[in-house]
Amino acid sequence: MELYLDSADINEIKEAFELGFLTGLTTTPTFMHRHGITDIDGTILELAKIVPVLQIEALGETADEIVAEAERQDALGLDRGKTVYKIPISVEGVKACRRLVDMGYMVNIHLVYTLQQAYMAMSAGASYVCPLVGRLQDQGHDALGLVQQCVEAVNYYGYDTRIMFSSVRNVEHVKNALNVGVHTVTVPWKIMKKLTENHFTQIGTDEFFEHTRLMTESVKDVIGANNPVVTSDKSIADALVVMTQGGFGAVTIVDGAQRPIGMFTDGDLRRLISKDGGNVIDKALTDLPMKQPISVEGMELLYTAEALLREKEVDTLVVTEDGKAIGMVDVQDLIKKS
């Protein structure tokens, strides 16, 4: 199934065609007007340099006017083998279609709302017939049934015509296009970008990134520049200042040689206040019971830190280098996405 972009926004057109596999671009005078385009010919020539196939409007009230407009645009320097002229369905439109096809042009008969209209376009040799699914559904019609009938007519009678599913409003419409077997679908960029999205895919991808990170990055890579330490001769108030300034929930208590001898956490503070009241912040850290904190060397992989956190059932490890405290690693540091 051919995949076209439906747009006149030059920036998103450039972005979309970086995908490298889109068939082409469909656009309309309405799109151009919406984006403030006044130099239609200049825009057409610019777009023709970007996209593999360009589908543009050839408007006129009579077959002669439609043919003349297609010839005028062709004379701008467009590649006839890479340009499709869009014509609204009408008696004059299908008459112009036949003449243009005989002259070697490709034609898209669009604004199709009935099978009878599609039949006239196919009979006229239209390269594309384009039912507008979203608009039809807005009016309460069985748009998918119409598209299915158009596909079946092409297949049954052997018309050299591709059915284009257009007026796409959501990702479900693209699924519908695949299910009914259309030859072509044209999709707005905001919807096309959603076609690869899935919640479970994102969960799996995040896990892959997380686990790869654990096996390839060292603990030192994630601890940052802040090193929340206080010496043992300081007070609880001093420890709180360090915790607050660094945005941490804990500080490492070190001796004079920067070796870790304990850890003080916001949880410890809450327990002390609950037990002894607010005056505890003036206490010296040496007055508190201390035990050697669990540490990991900065050169170790995050995988090792994760294993320690699980084994010891703690949320934070002191990070050391040659036995000296250089930072902290928290369980949240291990699940940050790359």
Identify the role of each PLM range.
Residues 78-80, 216-228, 280-293:
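Bateman (tandem CBS) regulatory domains
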Residues 12-19, 68-70, 96, 116-124, ...:
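Catalytic cores of alpha/beta
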Residues 262-267, 315, 320, 326-334:
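Short hydrophobic beta-strand motif reused across regulatory alpha/beta modules
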Residues 2-14, 19-22, 27-34, 38-99, ...:
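Active-site beta->alpha loop and helix N-cap motifs at the rims of alpha/beta catalytic domains
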